[in-house]
Curated annotation (Swiss-Prot):
Coiled coil: none
Domain of life assignment: Bacteria
Organism, as annotated: Caldicellulosiruptor bescii (strain ATCC BAA-1888 / DSM 6725 / KCTC 15123 / Z-1320) (Anaerocellum thermophilum)
Protein name per UniProt: Bifunctional protein PyrR
Example GO molecular function: RNA binding
Quaternary structure note: Homodimer and homohexamer; in equilibrium.
Known catalytic reactions: UMP + diphosphate = 5-phospho-alpha-D-ribose 1-diphosphate + uracil
Length: 182
């Protein structure tokens, strides 16, 4: 069996993000009070692409925030003694705003729970929605995405990698086959 299998190429990623952008606009009836927040790391890059798509469609550049959830993780003590902390930058008031959280892969739901907790510490949004490029299943918390690029049923012996130009000099999604369960 192959160790890596491509499940989305660059064009499929682009089309999925364009579709998600349209769905966000349709569900929210436009851009009023709408903001995007990308979850560090790759969620930020996907959020920027959604922001660009919406700007092309509506002619409006949505506010875009960057959220690091490291200190909100429920497994922080298991990660390492000195976890890598990225920056959080949300330069707009989130109170009474419709926030679309953007992440690359939805798996157990724990990252999203941490992101919601981090946002709630910053204010009281009117609504929080979730957009993900890949939903791979295996939820451990009652969390679901409002916008999904692709549902990809996986086993616990697989990891989904979303590759983006900004970090990987590539745009595609691959599944890695492991020898053990995660």
């Amino acid at each position: 069996m192959e160790k890596f299998k491509e499940i989305m190429d660059a064009n499929q990623m682009r089309r999925a993000l364009v579709r998600i952008s349209h769905e966000i606009l349709e569900k929210n009836k436009g851009v009023e009070n709408l903001c995007l927040v990308g979850i560090q790391r790759r969620g930020v890059n996907l959020a920027k692409r959604i922001q660009e798509n919406i700007e092309k469609i509506e002619g409006v550049k949505l506010p875009l925030g960057i959220l690091d959830i490291t200190f909100y993780r429920d497994d922080l003590s298991l990660l390492s003694e000195h976890p890598t902390v990225n920056s959080t930058r949300i330069d707009f008031d989130i109170n009474n705003k419709k926030i679309v959280l953007v992440d690359d892969v939805l798996f157990t739901g724990r990252t999203v729970r941490a992101a919601i907790e981090a946002l709630m510490d910053m204010g009281r949004p009117k609504m929080i929605q979730l957009a993900v490029l890949i939903d791979r299943g295996h939820r451990e918390l009652p969390i679901r995405a409002d916008y999904v690029g692709k549902n990809v049923p996986t086993s616990r012996k697989e990891i989904v990698h979303v590759l983006v130009d900004e970090f990987d000099n590539d745009n595609r999604v691959i599944i890695e086959q492991l020898d053990r369960e995660i």
